[in-house]
Amino acid sequence: LICGTRGSADAGLNLLLFVPLGFLVASRGRGPASSLLVGLAVSGLIEGWQLFLAGRHAGLSDLVWNSSGAFVGAALGAAGFVAVALMVGGSLMVPWQTDADYWGQWRPDLGSMPQYEGEVLEASLNDQPFPSYRLPAEPPHRRLLEVPWELAGTIVAGGPPRSVSPILSIYDRNRQEIMLLGAHRTDLVYRERTLARALRFDSPDVRILGGFLDIRAGDTVTVSASGGEELCLRIDDTERCGVGVTPGRSWGLLYYLEGPSESFRRTVDFLWLVALFMPIGFFSLGMRGWSMGAGIGLGGLGAAVLVTPMVTPGLAEIVACICGLGLGALTARVFEWVADKPTGLTESV
């Protein structure tokens, strides 16, 4: 049911696709069991149809996760689903190191990512030398990343890479990425192994946008990432603390878009929250129901920020939640108006 290195992300997408069907069935007074049956029927028709399409493949896993999505939507309701989804998403961002031995790497040539064109002059981990081979500390090496920790390096900057290029990284003996400090275009990029990665979801990275913007190839600069009460990234005199993944970026657990610009990703952040909160407004009954649903959804967002590694959303993400709630309610009213509109036909006598 879960296959491949990002099998859970694919399963999550299939589940999410049918959650609105569960909302719809539940709004007609049916329970989760009925939603499950409807989900099975609809997904079964789709999978059966794909048997006759060239290049398409029907799968049992799609049937299971689609129908599960309908069940979850009916069981939790729109507001409950948003709250649970954000809490689960935040929990998946917990750092999750392995117990295997760790290897340090200076601008490694990994094949899956371009090699950084600059040069690493020196590097340290927790003020101790950080070599480009097996870390000399006594195992388990995961203790090296217990807070507080700092990975830092002095480098000769290279040209801006078109995709994420590691400058300093830590991999374990099983070739699993534990930590990466690198560059992408003019951004300083940091990412680490999280519970999401361990469970085969995608995992968003964290950046200093334009960190290399005023740095030319050949300049000597220092870069670092440190963890304690909050995550801090630094490039020369530019430091950002409290950085991390916001609720709006939680879509990256299912399908993270690394290549596009940050402005594009922020647009996706906005639309993702609008899409999450819109069903709350659409399926709420009256102002009281709308207020309760909004409270549950926004409460779930606040709880995720308080008790998980998610960081506080910006104003744009708060506006996106409110827009979703309002747009959902407006769409419901439009549907009601269309349904009640006279057809113009008169009854014959």
Residue ranges of predicted features:
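Bulky hydrophobic segments
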Residues: 1-61, 67-349
